[in-house]
Amino acid sequence: MLRDIKLNYFTASHRVCQPEETLKNNEEKLKTAGITRITDITDLDRVGIPVFSAIRPRAQEGAVSVYAGKGAEKKQAEASAMMEGFERYSAEMQESDKEKIIVSSIEDMSGEKFINPKDMYLPPNITDDILDVTVLEWYPCIDLVSEEEYYVPANGIFHPYIPSNKSATPLFRGNTNGLASGNVLEEAVLHGIFEVIERDAWSIFELVHKNRRQIDNDSIENEVIRDLLDKFKAQSINVKLMDITSDVGVCTVTASSDDDVLRDPALLSLGVGTHLNPDIAIIRALTEVAQSRATQIHGTREDTTRANFMRHAGYDRM
């Protein structure tokens, strides 16, 4: 099922085609996904690093309806916003998905191949005894290595997860960790894995503050990175790069910024990037900082609780 794929875009990411092709190839799918508008919000901030916003007004309850896309180039940022919209649409449970779901307890799944929720990290109050008799929704998925079909708890697939059957019980609060789209299956799988590695490395760093090394900005020779750093520097925005690669061994970099001009605590932004190519990891972290800033200024996303708290706390305290 997984194939060797030839890459054709290397400027600020590794993709199978140019961003212009991504936009052209998927334009007709925007209506299906409910994406009504993709807007350039780069100029809302003074940095000048491309950021776009995509809007899905009819996103399901519990999901955000405004998404952001980042990139070192305009078309890359536009494609990024569009593809995030597709990700979120694909994560929602559609009517066609409900037709494939089965409702059963673990005890009654003995005749099927399934992913046992006992192997997942669950809230401590959900014990094995409770799991055995809890009625869950299960969705058929394909193992990409063995190409065999397994039933997986629907709670771990869909976001937001609202059981379609009243007798089914959610096990945990859902999230979009590891959700990724791509021009081809292999590209989506790779970037989903990168996101999981990235979140894992950041969690370890937050917990123990080890495996960190500051990167000397002046030592970087990559022209794309230099251009991004120069854009921040020209606007008196200090950027610190840290290598927080975990024991997994895939390069993970954080970029944190402090705006000496505005001194707005909500613009104390952080970006994290993971990639097999360290330069791409840095580019992803830097463009995520730009995305975070523009998103806060844009003020349309529903998940800005952190920014509101930081503004309330004040710049000096943060």
What do these predicted regions represent?
Residues 1-318:
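Helix-biased "structured C-terminal domain" signature
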